[in-house]
Amino acid sequence: MELKIVSSEIIKPSSPTPQHLRTHKLSVLDQVAGDSLFPVILFYPQACSNDTTKTSDHLKKSLSETLSKYHPFAGRFKDAFSIDCDDSGAVFVEACVAGEMSEILKQPKNDLLEELMPYKLNEKPSVPVNLAAKVTYFGCGGMALCVCFSHVIADITTAANFIKSWVAISRGFSTSNDIPDTFFDCSTVFPPQDFSSFSRNAFADNHSQSAEIITKRFTFDGVKLADLKEKIRKESSSGYQPTRVEAVSAVILGGIMSAEKEGEKFNHTNLVPSVSVNLRNRTNPPLPELSIGNIIQAAITKLPIEKRINYSKLTEQLHGSIRSIDDEYLKKFHAVGEFMNNMQNALIALFDPNNRGFTISSWCRRPLYEADFGWGKPIWVSTAMKHKDVAVLLDSNDGKGIEALVALPKKEMDKFEQDPGILAYASVDTSII
């Protein structure tokens, strides 16, 4: 795919940040997030006429208005504890491709998706922005919009809320004045810590990028997923009905266990999944849904790597670890003087040589497929990644199935694809159209 950069510029907020909102305090959850940008990529089959300039101008104007409500995304890091919301702005890149968008949608490979990003996955931006967008126009009239968010101040809920607000302003349904204030000082609930002895990325080293990492997309269609959930329910001693995410996670973890057992060196005795949990509705009182930040915490459990994979057992263990993260748990975990000890214990479990860590992040049930800027809803929403031992789960475009992006070492990916559960319930890198 031959892509040409047409322009790159800084988009500043349409109105200055009020003085009392100039400093955005980071919570400890923001501090321990990986210092990287994560992409949300939306594909529109008929997004523009021949006048791409008009489309870009419309996107830039509405982005400017949206930034006036999401002040940290136009700011810059001041120190390890705060962002200066100084209206420096966000990056907006415009690109074009002579070819058809269908070339990507028929075989959506990770390296092709990476080309649609304003920066490569392992690239450090020359300008230290917290948000960067790139619009790519195809010769067929289609368009891909990639929005990259700093993981320090955004989880997928924050990202989805930002895109939703951008859409509303773009369509004229709202102005920046209509959007509720998005600020909520999460540093009072999850107090920041002094991590001066090591970098923010110390917590992300287990998922370092590597050329040997392969990312593939596994699609669990709605019919097979419903059958899987029912099978798990029948096999469960308690009759527990798993969620779609729990069922897919169990199959993925089962595949990891199978790949471990088939490996040349079977060094791990336990699989330690780390499942990202949205904390907004788990505190008492709940945090506002529009809270800005990386307001997630990992539910960690230790699973013995066994010869016989039992999906009902896996889902119940996952469900138990997720359910345990409630207000009482969070208050104890983040109590004064306790956080560092609790975090250290979690890291010891993840980096124990007998344990194999694996991260699961669910983007399901976010309104990403509702992002209609005026030219229809996206035909596909995805992301790109190269982090080792990570799975990102997204809704399929029909809303019934789940697409799982799984990143593994190449040799292990070959074994993972041949796992009986993966073969039975998932299709690999299938066409979107």
Swiss-Prot record:
Gene: L1AT
Enzyme class: transferase
Domain of life the protein comes from: Eukaryota
Keywords assigned: Acyltransferase, Transferase
Subunit structure of this chain's protein: Monomer.
Full protein name: Epi-neemfruitin B synthase L1AT
Coiled coil: none
Function field: Acetyltransferase involved in the biosynthesis of limonoids triterpene natural products such as azadirachtin, an antifeedant widely used as bioinsecticide, and possessing many medicinal applications including anti-tumoral, anti-malarial, anti-rheumatic, antibacterial, anti-inflammatory, anti-pyretic and diuretic effects. Catalyzes the formation of epi-neemfruitin B from (21S)-21-acetyl-1-hydroxy-apo-melianone.
Annotated family: Belongs to the plant acyltransferase family.
Record bears the keyword Acyltransferase: yes
Active site positions: 151 (proton acceptor), 372 (proton acceptor)
GO MF: acyltransferase activity; oxidoreductase activity
Reaction catalyzed: (21S)-21-acetyl-1-hydroxy-apo-melianone + acetyl-CoA = epi-neemfruitin B + acetate + CoA + H(+)
EC code: 2.1.1.-
Tissue expression remark: Mainly expressed in petioles and, to a lower extent, in roots.
Pathway in which the depicted protein is active: Secondary metabolite biosynthesis; terpenoid biosynthesis
Tagged with keyword Manganese: no
Pfam families named among the record's database cross-references: Transferase (PF02458)
